[in-house]
Amino acid sequence: MKDPSRSSTSPSIINEDVIINGHSHEDDNPFAEYMWMENEEEFNRQIEEELWEEEFIERCFQEMLEEEEEHEWFIPARDLPQTMDQIQDQFNELVISDSSSLEDLVVKSNLNPNAKEFVPGVKY
């Protein structure tokens, strides 16, 4: 009976393809197994920078949230008048200017009184 592991359909193993402990058999460097540690300090520095950056971003977001909480926001339900009396009081507080101040504005104006009236969408 034939051994199935030695069947002719299985690929042949070439010496160059044999890898032991993650390294090829031809590796003559006795420290090849430890070469991943070669750049360990650089890797640690990079990870530390990423952690500092994440912490900085987190602090920025926290400060931004605190500023938003401190800021006085316009809330219509709270800030707009609710009753007709409040609206009437605000309306009464409005000052109606007299016509003499309007005449002063016209006299001091730099506008051309002979200019055509501006109408949006009309080309002259």
Swiss-Prot record:
Ubiquitinated, leading to its degradation by the proteasome. GO terms for molecular function: mRNA regulatory element binding translation repressor activity. GO terms for cellular component: cytoplasm. Keywords: Cytoplasm, Translation regulation, Ubl conjugation. The keyword Membrane does not apply. InterPro entries: PAIP2-like (IPR040396), PAM2_motif (IPR009818). Residues 105-120 are annotated as: PABPC1-interacting motif-2 (PAM2). Its main location: cytoplasm. Coiled coil: none annotated. GO terms for biological process: negative regulation of translational initiation. Residues 22-75 are annotated as: PABPC1-interacting motif-1 (PAM1). It is found in: Cytoplasm. The keyword Lyase does not apply. Interacts with the second and third RRM domains and C-terminus regions of PABPC1 in a 2:1 stoichiometry. Only the PABPC1-interacting motif-1 (PAM1) interferes with the binding of PABPC1 to poly(A) RNA and translation initiation. Belongs to the PAIP2 family. Acts as a repressor in the regulation of translation initiation of poly(A)-containing mRNAs. Its inhibitory activity on translation is mediated via its action on PABPC1. Displaces the interaction of PABPC1 with poly(A) RNA and competes with PAIP1 for binding to PABPC1. Its association with PABPC1 results in disruption of the cytoplasmic poly(A) RNP structure organization. This is Polyadenylate-binding protein-interacting protein 2. The gene is PAIP2.
